[in-house]
């Protein structure tokens, strides 16, 4: 006959009250419905707002946006639009969304290079060059290109003038051409632009000075001065079909030298020292 040993008492284990409740419900078939997941109402709008707020808190402004260069550009935009170039630093700090210390960093640099001056503790005034034309970069570039073209054209014209002056010097300095340095009445008469006009020819030594004062309503006055010899004045009234220059006009004033027809100049040796001469011609309409 077998002997029954007394049952040993097992050590107690820690059991979660929640798990014990579940076990009891599992043993009880009546409470099976209690195991079904309960409906939980979720407010999606609140969760969306919550997530968006978290993301907004994590978003940081780029480093460039808060750099001194960026703030200086924004500051200059405010200066350009400020009446009289006067700014209130308190308002500037508010518009830029920075501390006043950052604004003072900008104004101190501009004050050091004499671009702004302090009107009061919180007010500065722009004293630099006009900022209204700083935005016209394309127009400025176009003007620079036009200026470059004009400079190139000016250089080309200077070369042409220099070349013409050299040719004229070689022409007048040639001894063979010296004896032909004159014009005749027929030469003047052949010029179409001189027809029906009064032409006054002047023969004067070198360095003769000719002054034409402001013309009057009915006349024009010409002053001719020479310190190296006499001045010869010739009246040549060119008319269509005329073949002589001996005609005179009442509208031409007299001069110290008598008017005479054009003739071939004959070189003469100067025995006397040069005499000063002055001619005053007045032509009336």
From Swiss-Prot:
Keyword Repressor: yes
Motif (DEF box): 95-129
Region (Disordered): 240-285
Positions of region (Leucine-zipper): 143-164
Chain positions of cross-link Glycyl lysine isopeptide (Lys-Gly) (interchain with G-Cter in SUMO2): 9
Dimerization: region residues: 130-222
MF term (GO), any: RNA polymerase II cis-regulatory region sequence-specific DNA binding
Bias (Basic and acidic residues): 260-272
DNA-binding region: 50-129
A Pfam family: E2F_TDP
Database matches in SUPFAM superfamilies: E2F-DP heterodimerization region, Winged helix' DNA-binding domain
Compartment list: Nucleus
Biased composition regions of type Polar residues, renumbered to the chain: 241-259
GO cellular component, one term: RNA polymerase II transcription regulator complex
Chain segments carrying region Transcription repression: 173-285
Role according to the record: Inhibitor of E2F-dependent transcription. Binds DNA cooperatively with DP proteins through the E2 recognition site, 5'-TTTC[CG]CGC-3'. Has a preference for the 5'-TTTCCCGC-3' E2F recognition site. E2F6 lacks the transcriptional activation and pocket protein binding domains. Appears to regulate a subset of E2F-dependent genes whose products are required for entry into the cell cycle but not for normal cell cycle progression. Represses expression of some meiosis-specific genes, including SLC25A31/ANT4.
Family membership noted in the UniProt record: Belongs to the E2F/DP family.
PANTHER family to which the protein is assigned, alphabetical: TRANSCRIPTION FACTOR E2F, TRANSCRIPTION FACTOR E2F6
Name of the protein: Transcription factor E2F6
Native source organism of the sequence: Bos taurus
Primary gene name: E2F6
């Amino acid at each position: 006959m077998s002997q029954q040993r007394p049952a040993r008492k097992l050590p107690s284990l820690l059991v979660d009250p929640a798990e014990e409740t579940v076990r009891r419900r599992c043993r009880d078939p009546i409470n099976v419905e209690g195991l079904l997941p309960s409906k939980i109402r979720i407010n999606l709008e609140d969760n969306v707002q919550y997530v968006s707020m978290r993301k907004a808190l994590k978003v940081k402004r780029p480093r460039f946006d808060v750099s001194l260069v960026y703030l200086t550009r924004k500051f200059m935009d405010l200066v350009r639009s400020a009446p009289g170039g006067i700014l209130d630093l308190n308002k500037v700090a508010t518009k830029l969304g920075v501390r006043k210390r950052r604004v003072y960093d900008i104004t101190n640099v501009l004050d050091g290079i004499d671009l702004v001056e302090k009107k009061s503790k919180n007010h500065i005034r722009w004293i630099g060059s006009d900022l209204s034309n700083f935005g016209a970069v394309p127009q400025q570039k176009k003007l620079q290109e036009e200026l470059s073209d004009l400079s190139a054209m000016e250089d080309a014209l200077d070369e042409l003038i220099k070349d013409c002056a050299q040719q004229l010097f070689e022409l007048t300095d040639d001894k063979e051409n010296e004896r032909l340095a004159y014009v005749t009445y027929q030469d003047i008469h052949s010029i179409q632009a001189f027809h029906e006009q009064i032409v006054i020819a002047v023969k004067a030594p070198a360095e003769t000075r000719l002054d034409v004062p402001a013309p009057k309503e009915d006349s024009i006055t010409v002053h001719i001065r020479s310190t190296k010899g006499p001045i010869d004045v010739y009246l040549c009234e060119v008319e269509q079909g005329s073949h002589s220059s001996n005609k005179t006009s009442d509208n031409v004033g007299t001069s110290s030298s008598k008017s005479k027809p054009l003739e071939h100049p004959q070189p003469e040796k100067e025995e006397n020292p040069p005499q000063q001469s002055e001619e005053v011609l007045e032509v009336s309409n």
